[in-house]
Amino acid sequence: TQIKEFDAFPTLEQLPLWGFDGSSTQQAEGRSSDCVLKPVAIYPDPARTNGALVMCEVMMPDGVTPHASNARATILDDEDAWFGFEQEYFFYQNGRPLGFPEQGYPAPQGPYYTGVGYSNVGDVAREIVEEHLDLCLAAGINHEGINAEVAKGQWEFQIFGKGSKKAADQIWMARYLLQRLTEKYGIDIEYH
């Protein structure tokens, strides 16, 4: 996460390339560590008035050549194709899935999938997933739904997007929003 201020909400074309030290992110060695962030998608930041979230590709110092870690640059973009993603994940707190007892495991699966009630979904999980849904919608992400999954502490959200790169950008931005949101709850995410 990096923050840059503008006088007004920028367009994608107004966003500059942004250099960074690739050795800090293990994307370059110290003797030749320059890397560049190239903005490729912009979303309104629902957590900040007049804020923007910017998805970037990592480029070599020339700003044109994709960095070896830049898998997005390899995507053949089909702007007319529709893609749907189901992102499953666990909430983790204190080294174990949220809702798991300190010793052992919760009751066998069954009541958790699309479950309701404190004993099935806990006290904070639903609050987080619903707030995440609202954040995604406010950011313009085509978030299609949420549900509790088969294990305690396990959830899923669905993203449906048109265009190969646009759909991929939306799932990455939705993941980012979820991780940023869970910081305030002291909870980690394990995606699978």
Segments predicted by a language model, with ranges:
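Conserved short loop/turn motifs at secondary-structure junctions
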Residues: 161-163
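Active-site-proximal, well-structured secondary-structure segments within enzyme catalytic domains
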Residues: 145-158
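Gly/Pro-rich turn-and-neighbor structural signature
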Residues: 158, 167-173, 179-191
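A short alpha-helix capping/helix-coil boundary motif
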Residues: 110-113, 155-159
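ATP/Mg2+-dependent ligation/transfer catalytic cores
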Residues: 1-148, 166-173, 187
